[in-house]
């Protein structure tokens, strides 16, 4: 058995400005920082063996801030993919026992919003019409101009989860994923076997952890309080 913790990053500066963010690398706002710390307090007693984030800073900030309150007192350290960086950041002491590896991947990035990125959501609705913007945002396979649909997002998140993260859970490793609303929705669709209609109604608030227990056969959603 193993725990899987999913956390949508805290509010970003652009979330608060009501702008489409997507792959634009925007940091957390002060409210987002507070949300990340509070989320860490909620999951502080759950075992965590490894952490995964997207390549975007708001995802990384959320994970690092959340872990400052973990009861294990272990420190996250980033595992670099580049061979030279990987070798140069190697730990040669017992201190490694007090650390938790953190892996970053663009496969977990937010849905890419294409030509909507940086635009105000309300102004976009006024420009293109509310129905068109609703289709771009809430349909399963319709993408905004030069952007991704939720389906497209799942085409990178789900294989990464199945090939890289799921084997860890099968080996009883407890995993914490800090990512984004749409990348996590696509993962939850796979984990909970949701239909296209069901996933479209799924809302994930910022800074609110979801916890699953992998039983060896299935994922079970755990109620709060966790631990």
Curated annotation (Swiss-Prot):
Belongs to the phosphoglycerate mutase family. BPG-dependent PGAM subfamily. The record marks 180 as: Transition state stabilizer. Coiled coil: none annotated. GO terms for molecular function: phosphoglycerate mutase activity. Keywords: Gluconeogenesis, Glycolysis, Isomerase. Pfam families: His_Phos_1. It is an enzyme of class 5 (isomerase). The keyword Isomerase applies. GO terms for biological process: gluconeogenesis; glycolytic process. Catalyzes the interconversion of 2-phosphoglycerate and 3-phosphoglycerate. The active site is at residues 9, 110. It catalyses: (2R)-2-phosphoglycerate = (2R)-3-phosphoglycerate. The keyword Signal does not apply. Substrate binds at residues 8-15, 21-22, 58, 110-113, 121, 137-138, 181-182. This is 2,3-bisphosphoglycerate-dependent phosphoglycerate mutase. InterPro entries: His_Pase_superF_clade-1, His_PPase_superfam, Phosphogly_mut1. Pathway: Carbohydrate degradation; glycolysis; pyruvate from D-glyceraldehyde 3-phosphate: step 3/5. CDD domains: HP_PGM_like (cd07067). Its EC number is 5.4.2.11.
């Amino acid at each position: 058995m193993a725990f899987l913790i999913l956390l949508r990053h805290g509010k970003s500066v652009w979330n608060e400005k009501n702008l489409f963010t997507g792959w634009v690398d925007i940091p957390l706002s002060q409210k987002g920082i507070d949300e990340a710390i509070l989320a860490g307090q909620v999951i502080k007693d759950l075992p965590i063996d490894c952490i995964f984030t997207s390549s975007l800073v708001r995802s990384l900030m959320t994970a690092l801030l959340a872990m400052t309150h973990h009861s294990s007192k272990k420190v996250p350290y980033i595992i670099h993919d580049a061979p030279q960086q990987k070798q140069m950041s190697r730990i040669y002491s017992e201190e490694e026992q007090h650390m938790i590896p953190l892996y970053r991947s663009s496969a977990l990035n937010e849905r890419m919003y294409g030509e909507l990125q940086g635009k105000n959501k309300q102004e976009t609705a006024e420009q293109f019409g509310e129905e068109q913007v609703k289709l771009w945002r809430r349909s399963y396979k319709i993408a905004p101009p030069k952007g991704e649909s939720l389906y497209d997002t799942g085409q990178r998140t789900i294989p990464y989860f199945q090939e890289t993260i799921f084997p860890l859970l099968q080996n009883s490793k407890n995993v914490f994923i800090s990512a984004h609303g749409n990348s996590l929705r696509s993962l939850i669709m796979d984990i909970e076997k949701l239909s296209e209609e069901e996933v479209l109604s799924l809302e994930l608030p910022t800074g609110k952890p979801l916890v699953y227990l992998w039983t060896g056969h299935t994922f079970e959603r755990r109620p709060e309080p966790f631990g």
